[in-house]
A protein has these predicted regions:
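Active-site flanking residues adjacent to catalytic metal/cofactor-binding acidic residues
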Residues: 45-46, 78-79, 161, 208, ...
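N-terminal active-site segment of His-dependent metallophosphoesterases
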Residues: 27-93, 182, 186-187, 194, ...
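Short acidic, glycine-rich surface-loop motifs adjacent to enzyme active sites
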Residues: 199-215
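Residue-level marker for buried hydrophobic side chains located in beta-strands
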Residues: 41-43, 74-76, 113, 206, ...
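Extended active-site neighborhood of metal-dependent phosphoesterases/phosphodiesterases
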Residues: 63, 82-202, 219, 223-239, ...
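Residue-level signal for glycine
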Residues: 305-307
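N-terminal secretory signal peptides and thylakoid transit peptides that target proteins
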Residues: 1-19
Length: 317
């Protein structure tokens, strides 16, 4: 039977992905992408549901991945607690959605976290203050930067953003608009410009909850495209990681690689291919990353431990 154009494109996409993943599935790419002088870390978002809707399954696979390649830290890209954030540092969700879910020994490393739109429904300051209760939880401020050494000669600067004030609020979030409106976007934008300008690290990675571009349910974020993307281009940022859409995606805007890791729980299957899409799948899962001096290896893994996609981001001059 003759294939339609859509069937042909889908077949070609699957075949191309299978070819690309073949060396990784055999273990050769993992070994090549994980030299002794490298930084391993995990990224997950949109997760805090009292262990429900695949959260426990994803947590289990994160632990197994970190057993294989020990993660120095974990990045949470926001929407840490559903549906309405946390009320205080004593909120039961700290236990039911975090401490009692990510229990693997390999996950007892620093978690560097940012806020998502659902976190804005609750007490944002409590997420900053919780570090005093649990040393592995880290959110020094609503936006911040930090540096990690890759090896003796190379470092990476991470820039953690507070993107909810940059987003178009959903109808059910309008009651929380005061919390969002109180944030000074111009100040955050000036901070990011200055921080990127001051960075001398060969690797620059930006983390936000909301996407630049996305084929997922929420789609693109116009403010980020207009105001943040030009800064990423200007200062040679290699990668931007986000959540918000409950799926796994790799998109590209010029030389900047955009990764969605919003599959921490309750996946959404609505996903379309855009002009920027390189990969996308509506499923639960997370990202395992390995950063060496010359390349960043990104692996997308689902809640059953299946490797769905892998790619390498080269260092930019």
């Amino acid at each position: 039977m003759k294939q339609t154009r859509r069937q042909f494109v889908r077949t070609l996409f699957v075949a191309t992905q299978a070819t690309a993943l073949a060396p990784l599935l055999s273990g050769r790419l993992l070994a090549a992408g994980n030299p002794a002088a490298a930084l391993n870390f995990l990224l997950v978002g949109d997760w805090g549901r009292n262990g429900e809707k695949d959260q426990v399954a994803v947590a289990k696979q994160m632990g197994l991945a970190a057993d294989q390649n020990p993660a120095k830290f974990i990045i949470s890209v926001g929407d840490n607690f559903y549906e309405d954030g946390v009320k205080s540092v004593d909120d039961p969700q700290w236990q039911s959605s975090f401490e009692q879910v990510y229990t693997a020994a390999s996950l007892q490393v620093p978690w560097w976290s940012i806020l998502g739109n659902h976190d804005y429904h609750g007490n944002c300051d409590a997420q900053i203050e919780y570090h005093l209760r649990s040393p592995r939880w880290n959110m020094p401020a609503r936006y911040y930067t930090r540096t990690e050494q890759i090896d003796a000669a190379n470092a990476v600067d991470f820039f953690y953003l507070d993107t909810t004030p940059m987003s178009k609020l959903d109808a059910d979030e309008l009651m929380f608009h005061g919390n969002v409106k109180s944030q000074d976007l111009a100040r955050q934008l000036a901070w990011l410009d200055a921080a990127l300008a001051a960075s001398t690290a060969p690797w620059k990675i930006v983390v936000g909850h909301h996407p630049v571009y996305s084929g997922g349910q929420h789609g693109d974020t116009p403010y980020i495209i207009k105001h943040i993307l030009p800064l990423l281009e200007k200062y040679g940022v290699q990668a931007y990681f986000n959540g918000h859409d409950h799926d796994l995606q790799h998109l590209q805007a010029g030389k900047i690689n955009l990764f969605c890791t919003g599959g921490g729980s309750k996946p959404r299957t609505q996903l379309k291919t855009t002009a920027h899409t390189k990969f996308g799948l509506g499923c639960s899962g997370f990202i395992a990353a390995t950063l060496a001096a010359e390349q960043l290896d990104v692996r997308m893994i689902d809640d059953q431990g299946k490797l769905l996609y892998a790619t390498t981001v080269p260092r930019r001059a």
